[in-house]
Amino acid sequence: MKKGMFLLTIITTILVSCSHKQKTSPKPFGYIRIDFPQHRYKLFDSASFPYAFEYPIYAKIEKDNDVNTEPFWINIYFPKFMARIHLTYHKINNNLDTLLDDSHILVYKHTVKADNITAKDYTNDSMHVYATLFTLEGNAATPFQFHIMDSTKNFVRGSLYFHVRPRYDSLYPYISFIGEDIKHLIETFRWK
């Protein structure tokens, strides 16, 4: 009798628990709220440097501490975004073609991961500033690279890196935001 009662209770519990129809509904999309600071800038104009430009107030200028660092190499560090723009400077000594080729090679090295690479030229004849900004879409290690020159004496190359695994769709808001800062840097760049 006890066995029969126990078995009846188990069967009833199983039937009752399976008979309820649950209403299922898709979960709504959730997006991370990103509070970006206002684009405001300050001037980098070190007396010893051959160039000057404006950079965001929420970024820091750091000396490049790499073993192969040359004079006037710096990083613009974005602590809130875990990103860094590496700036390298070279004096032009009949090697402009080599510097431009190296710049293009470093950009197109990323074709394996980049879905698209576009180039935009910037020209400021009055300041002798000539620049090309490369935008790399997709999961490339760097979303922006650029070079700036006066075509006779000075050459600066820059690249943006995030200190996280490159996932373009996740990083896109940050890439777009810092992209505006890079454009501003190029537009305010001047030689001394």
What label would you give each PLM region?
Residues 102-159:
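Signature of long, low-cysteine stretches enriched in small and polar/charged residues
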Residues 48-101:
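Secretory pathway targeting signatures of secreted, lumenal, and periplasmic proteins
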Residues 14-17:
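C-terminal motif of bacterial Sec signal peptides marking the signal peptidase cleavage site
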Residues 19-22:
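Bacterial signal peptide processing site
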Residues 1-4:
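Positively charged n-region of N-terminal signal peptides that target proteins for export
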Residues 27-47:
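Post-signal peptide N-terminal segment of mature Sec-exported envelope proteins
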Residues 159-192:
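Surface-exposed amphipathic alpha-helical segments
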